[in-house]
Regions:
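Small/polar-residue-rich segments within soluble enzyme cores
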Residues: 1-24, 29
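Catalytic helix-loop patch of NAD(P)-dependent Rossmann-fold dehydrogenases
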Residues: 96-100, 104, 140-187, 208
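Conserved Rossmann-fold NAD(P)-dependent oxidoreductase catalytic core, especially the SDR/UDP-sugar
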Residues: 111-157, 180
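Mid/C-terminal beta-alpha module of Rossmann-like enzyme folds, strongest
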Residues: 227-230, 234-290, 315-326
């Protein structure tokens, strides 16, 4: 456990959601960016995307797998973008040593990198937090829409390890050292890990799938990369901001499965007859119920949280995102 959240008010835990007003993307402003987390899926995809679409961003990356990064000179960079972390946690029956590993990587490392960036004169630090700081998905049949008044309340050590860093790096912000915290929902794209590949496997195998009217926020990797490029080229007035990028539309699990099947040339029938089985599965304690609620539960951000005047990043809709992911 770490104690950066101790004594914080609800407002401090939530943070300053969004910019303080309209912003303007200045594509002529050259920025030097250092990614801390070389070889990561998000870091490498972003680096390639920015290289293709935003030549004003000059990007390097440093490996965080050993301590050699501590000798790196951060002083020539305008922005440090910290992506190193452990995700996709199986939080059941985990020993204390494993939990400590999550805190060392997700909390301690992030804070250490942020302090180094500030000490060496970097102007801006961008931290990848996660929607997981708001807890688990609501179970099947229950709604969950996070808005700007929702207080982060992690359900497990993984979420807490992210929130501790989320709060700690914002505490380091001042007028000369801006901190941007991103709390994205599930990120997916070609080569991604996590829940999406598991869902895609089912879509390619199953002839039928339950018709569940759930609501989930998701973020395609190209939309994230576009968002990152644009926010790196804007100025904002508050020392720290919390940003919530997501796709323009919420996703239903059944709709996503149908689209994956269609892109892969396979017809998946979406039928309501299986819904009672899903309901029963959601009531089973332990891993089965957890998996059912993870797939068919509700976890969405209010769309208004993800609209920023001057930023136009939601370029890829659901159908196109699946085509790019499966193509």
């Amino acid at each position: 456990m770490r104690n950066y959240t101790d004594g914080k008010s609800a407002e401090q835990l939530i943070g300053h959601i969004g910019f303080c007003g309209p912003v303007e993307v200045d594509t002529s402003s050259v920025k030097k960016v250092l990614i801390t987390g070389a070889g990561s899926y998000i870091g490498e995809t972003f680096r390639a995307y920015a290289g293709k679409h935003y030549p004003a961003l000059h990007i390097d990356a440093v490996d965080m797998l050993d301590r050699s990064w501590k000798k790196a000179d951060f002083s020539s960079y305008d922005i440090v973008y910290h992506v190193a972390g452990i995700a996709h946690a199986d939080v059941g029956n985990v020993d204390d040593a494993t939990k400590e590993k999550y805190y060392k990587v997700n909390t301690d490392l992030a804070v250490e990198v942020c302090k180094k960036a500030k000490a060496e004169g970097v102007k801006e630090f961008i931290f990848m937090s996660s929607m997981i700081v708001y807890g688990d998905s609501a179970p099947y049949g229950k709604k969950k829409v996070v808005d700007e008044h929702t207080v982060p309340q992690p359900a497990n050590f993984y979420g807490d390890s992210k929130l501790q860093a989320d709060v700690a790096v914002r505490d380091l912000a001042d007028d000369k050292f801006k901190v941007v915290v991103l709390r994205p929902p599930m990120i997916y794209g070609k080569g991604s890990k996590g829940n999406y590949p598991s869902l895609a496997k089912l879509a390619k195998k199953l002839p039928i799938f339950p018709k569940i009217e759930n609501e989930r926020s998701m973020l395609h990797i190209d939309n994230l990369c576009e968002f990152l490029c644009q926010i790196m080229l804007v100025e904002f007035c508050t020392p720290s901001v919390v940003l919530i990028p997501q796709n323009a539309e919420w996703t239903k699990t059944s709709e996503m499965v149908r689209e994956i099947g269609e892109v892969c040339g396979k017809r998946v029938r979406i039928v309501g007859i299986l819904n009672p089985a899903v309901w029963l599965g959601s009531k089973v304690p332990g891993k089965i119920g957890g998996l059912v609620n993870k797939a068919f539960g509700n976890s969405a951000y209010a769309q208004s949280m993800s609209v920023y005047e001057g930023i136009d990043y939601q370029k890829v809709d659901l159908k196109e995102s699946i085509r790019r992911t499966e193509g």
